């Protein structure tokens, strides 16, 4: 049964035949737009919350570590599903493609149940471990509890969008993200500023607007998979989880989850380093993460277009197309990073002004943005290579790089530099860490090229 062949439709055919550069643009642009919209509504959340108070902004910033852990599980599982599904399509294996999709949705439900429990048990101690300010803690508790307890929409939205992206239907994935983002942006000011009552205002309102938007996006993306995606047939009658499919998903997905979890640990501990200076520094750090998402999210969107192309052509044994996809993606990533660098370098006051920055916040934030942005030019290459490792089924390389960058290098460097008593020195730890990251990325890619990509040339003629 597992050898049943897949009758590929036109979108799948073009992944193996269309010229790589226009193909990458065709698949990536919708995802880049949707990621930009995603970044926009994340920023809009903080812009509106900042108008409530700086404490509210700090509370949302402190919530980021646990919230990012939640996203890590959802996105990381989706990465595993995306890579395995696109590879199955390249191999023309219908049965495996269907089982991958069905088990991916099952894992999304399981992930939600885990964070439902965490939302009811660990949120309060999590906040009071970071701050003694009761106002900041209580605002953060209200925000994060809602985000965790009602996170089913987020997990389902992410998984369904990965299924659409893996089958090259990135425009449909973009539509579902746009729906969720637009709903969130509309509801943010309505809830946050108390138009639905004081009990639903402030950080509580921000959380409600977020989860409602996620449920809307989940509903749209699930419908699109059922009605507009003929290359996977979802049939849950008599569904039973497949240990084999889940194992294959997490062989790629677990390193991605762990890699993003490392980011949560880094953020949590960096907040502790910065809190020793002032709570305003934590708010600046939170604002930086919101702002840099405008730079990084388009690249992550391009990755969503790149990974299926690499996965498909890896399965189809077409090494030239794999290499050309990587080169094109890296060129575009560096171009995007250059634009981000220039904006952060020359307009930091304008960017911080979006968040109603006080004079104290501007004094800390302007040099922070100007220093941190130096790592952008290096990060573009690291991000593309990291996704390449995942697309080729070697996510462990991505994990090793992430751990080295954020735990082995960045945090110790930040801690040591904080001992100078000069907060500006702490921001240089990002640049130091990225230098290590990009070096490791190229070392690992050289190994991967030798072990996986080059041997494909032996079979390329027969496949083509």
Task: For each feature predicted by the language model, list its residue ranges.
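Short runs within selected transmembrane alpha-helices of multi-pass transporters and secretion channels
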Residues: 78, 147-165, 173-181, 206-221, ...
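Hydrophobic transmembrane alpha-helices of multi-pass small-molecule transporters
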Residues: 69-72, 116, 184-189, 218-222, ...
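Small-residue-rich hydrophobic transmembrane alpha-helices
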Residues: 57-117, 154-173, 284-342, 346-348, ...
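Residue-level signal for short hydrophobic patches within transmembrane helices
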Residues: 17, 21-40, 44, 66-73, ...
């Amino acid at each position: 049964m597992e050898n049943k062949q897949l009758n590929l439709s036109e979108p799948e055919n073009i992944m193996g035949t269309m010229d790589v550069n226009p193909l990458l643009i065709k698949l990536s642009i919708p995802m880049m737009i949707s990621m930009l919209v995603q970044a926009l509504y994340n920023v809009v959340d903080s812009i509106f919350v900042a108008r409530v108070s700086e404490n509210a902004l700090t509370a949302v910033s402190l919530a980021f570590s646990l919230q990012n852990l939640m996203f890590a599980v959802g996105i990381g599982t989706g990465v595993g599903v995306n890579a395995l599904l696109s590879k199955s399509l390249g191999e023309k294996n219908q049965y495996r493609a269907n089982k991958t999709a069905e088990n991916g949705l099952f894992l999304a439900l399981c992930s939600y149940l885990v964070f439902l429990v965490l939302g009811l048990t660990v949120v309060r101690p999590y906040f009071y471990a970071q701050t003694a300010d009761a106002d900041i803690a209580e605002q953060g508790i209200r925000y994060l509890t809602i985000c965790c307890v009602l996170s089913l929409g987020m997990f389902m939205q992410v998984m369904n969008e990965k299924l659409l992206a893996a089958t090259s239907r990135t425009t449909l994935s973009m539509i579902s993200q746009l729906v969720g983002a637009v709903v969130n942006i509309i509801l943010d000011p309505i809830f946050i500023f108390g138009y639905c009552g004081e009990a639903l205002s402030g950080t509580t309102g921000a959380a409600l607007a977020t989860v409602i938007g996620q449920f809307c996006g989940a509903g749209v993306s699930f419908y699109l998979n059922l009605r507009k995606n003929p290359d996977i047939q979802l049939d849950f009658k008599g569904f039973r989880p497949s240990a084999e499919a889940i194992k294959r998903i997490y062989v790629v997905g677990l390193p991605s989850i762990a890699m993003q979890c490392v980011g949560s640990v880094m953020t949590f501990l960096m907040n502790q380093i910065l809190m020793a200076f002032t709570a305003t520094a934590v708010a600046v750090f939170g604002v930086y993460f919101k702002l840099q998402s405008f730079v990084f999210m388009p690249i992550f969107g391009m990755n969503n277009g790149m990974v299926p192309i690499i996965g498909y052509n890896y399965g189809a044994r077409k090494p030239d197309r794999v290499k050309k996809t990587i080169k094109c993606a890296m060129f575009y990533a560096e171009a995007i990073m250059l634009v981000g660098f220039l904006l952060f370098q020359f307009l930091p006051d304008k960017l911080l002004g979006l968040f109603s920055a006080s004079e104290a916040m501007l004094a800390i934030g302007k040099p922070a943005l100007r220093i941190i942005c130096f790592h952008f030019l290096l990060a573009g290459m690291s991000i593309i290579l990291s996704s390449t490792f995942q697309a080729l089924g070697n996510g462990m390389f991505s994990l090793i790089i992430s751990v080295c960058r954020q735990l082995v290098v960045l945090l110790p460097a930040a801690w040591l530099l904080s001992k100078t008593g000069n907060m500006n020195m702490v921001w240089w730890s990002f640049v130091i860490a990225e230098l290590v990251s990009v070096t490791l990325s190229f070392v690992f890619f050289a190994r991967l090229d030798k072990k996986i990509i080059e041997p494909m040339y032996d079979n390329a003629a027969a496949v083509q």
